[in-house]
Amino acid sequence: MSDSESEEATKINTDPVDNAWSLKIPAFKETDNPHGMIEESSFATLFPKYREKYLKEVWPLVEQAVGEHHLKAELDLVEGSMVVKTTRKTWDPYIIIKARDMIKLMARSVPFEQAKRVLQDEIGCDIIKIGNLVQKKEKFVKRRQRLIGPNGATLKSIELLTDCYVLVQGNTVSALGPYKGLQQVRDIVLETMNNVHPIYNIKALMIKRELMKDPKLANEDWSRFLPKFKNKNLSKRKQPKVKKPKKEYTPFPPAQPESKIDKQLASGEYFLNKEQKQAKRQQERQTKQAEAAKKQDERRNKDFIPPTEEPPTGSKRKANDNDSSDSRVDVQSLKAKLLKANKKSKS
């Protein structure tokens, strides 16, 4: 190591970092690895049948893109696989991982124009599996559609806020962009599949973006500015009408139930002889029969008992008086009418 290189090493800043995302990672150059790779590395991935036509059309562009990094790409239409390999000229040890991510994204229906961006140093990708996060298929489809939004509006807003390309395909969500944005996309997707609407996280990201512009709030807690949403999903369990109170906890086991002999000892029946027991049973039987006969007589005589009449109230009494006055006939006037009628008939 020369003196100039040792001086540069001593000038490295060791102060605490306020924002780790703002740090620039030094670029890896060809001079850092002049001898290349010792062994050949390769990665292969399968692709579905419906992607065969598209991949066949863009494969010359794929070979050109990986050829700039001294890699080799192969397309096997018989087995339905894509392979990327290192060559003797390959000097970047991590570029094979980037190329593997590129062919994985292309197999997940990501277009080549977007997938080739993953070969850049500041760009990464994340394939989020969402198929096993929800048990019922109806709920899974509903929450996945909630992530896309009406006419793709929700997905577009996520892309604008995170600077990432997001594609929802089947049981996976493919994201491509800066590493900070990938972290935010993963959080939004997982919370959406856990029944948290994505609009809440989008609103929080918009507020954070505005707060980042104010340097006075750099060292303050932002939780007071962020919206707090309460869960409105109430328990759908039907509450019983009569709730049984819980018994007090006792460390001792419950008392042993009394046997037939214990009950006979308590009542004194155990010490009676056979004739006395039979007489007691006969007496109990007679008392039961007498009670049953009494109840049966009451049930039979119930129909012959006259109902109790209520005494008439004041209004009813007046109505009865009016009816009786109307029903009275004037005998004298009736006689006079009859005499008149007889005279007319004689004349």
Curated annotation (Swiss-Prot):
Which gene codes for it?
dbe
Localisation per UniProt entry: Nucleus, Nucleolus
Keywords annotated in UniProt: Coiled coil, Developmental protein, Nucleus, Ribonucleoprotein, Ribosome biogenesis, RNA-binding, rRNA processing
Question: Per its UniProt record, what Gene3D superfamilies does this chain match?
Answer: K Homology domain, type 1 (3.30.1370.10)
The subunit structure is: Monomer. Component of the ribosomal small subunit (SSU) processome.
Quote a single Gene Ontology cellular component term.
nucleoplasm
Instruction: Please report the name of this protein according to its UniProt entry.
Output: KRR1 small subunit processome component homolog
Where are the residues of the annotated region Disordered? Answer: 231-347
The species this protein belongs to is Drosophila willistoni (Fruit fly)
The parts of the chain that form a coiled coil are: 271-304
Recorded superkingdom = Eukaryota
**InterPro entries recorded for this chain?**
KH_dom, KH_dom_type_1_sf, KRR1-like_KH1, KRR1-like_KH1_euk, KRR1-like_KH2, KRR1-like_KH2_euk, rRNA_assembly_KRR1
GO-annotated biological processes: rRNA processing
Provide the family line. Answer: Belongs to the KRR1 family.
